[in-house]
C-alpha cells in the first residue's frame, strides 16, 4: 500500500505565493519608469524632428498623399496593446530615419539625438513588453501591426521611387511628425 505524501506545510504555500507576488510586483514596477518619460517623449521628439529637418531649400510640389494611413486602427484603451503598437511604430521610424540616404540639409547631430531618444524609449517599451509577456499570454490582433508595416513599406518605396529627393524626404518628415502625434495619442489614451 502506498504511503500518502506528507501534507505540504501551509508556510510552503505562503512562500510560493509571496514569490509569485514579488515577481509580479517587480514586473509592474519595471513599467512604471515609462510614465514620466511618456509625458515628454512626443513633445521632445517633435522638437528634435523640427530642429533636424528644416524645410527643403526649394519648394516641393504637392504629392498625391502617398501612403495614406487609416489611424482608426490605432484606437485602443489597452495599455499593453498601445505599448506594442508604439514599439512597432518606433522601430519603423528608427529604421527609416537612420538610413544613409537622408538629405544633406538635415542636421545630423539633431537626427542622432532623435534616433537616440527613439531607441531609448523603444528599449524601455521592449523591457515592459517582455515583463508583461511573462505574466500574460494574451495574443493581440495583428491587423494594426500589418497596417503599420504596409504603411512604412509604402514610405520606403516612395523614397526609392523619388530617388530619395529632398522633397520625398520632406514628405517622410511630415509622416514622422504624424506618427509621433499618434504615439502621443496612444500614450495619453492609455496612461490617463
UniProtKB/Swiss-Prot annotation:
SUPFAM superfamilies per UniProt: 4-helical cytokines (SSF47266)
Source lineage: Eukaryota, Metazoa, Chordata, Craniata, Vertebrata
Organism (species): Meleagris gallopavo
Gene Ontology terms: biological process: defense response to virus; immune response
Cellular compartments per GO CC: extracellular space
Major localization listed first in the record, in broad terms: secreted
Record function comment: Has antiviral activities.
Keywords: Antiviral defense, Cytokine, Disulfide bond, Glycoprotein, Secreted, Signal
GO molecular function, one term: cytokine activity
Domain of life: Eukaryota
Carbohydrate attachment residues: 70, 77
Localization of this protein: Secreted
Family: Belongs to the alpha/beta interferon family.
Signal peptide stretch: 1-30
Cysteines paired by S-S bonds: 31-128, 60-154, 67-167
Name of this chain's protein: Interferon
InterPro entries, per database record: 4_helix_cytokine-like_core, Interferon_alpha/beta/delta
Claim: Secreted is one of the keywords in the record: yes
Gene3D superfamilies associated with the record: 1.20.1250.10
One Pfam family this sequence matches: Interferon
PROSITE patterns, per database record: INTERFERON_A_B_D
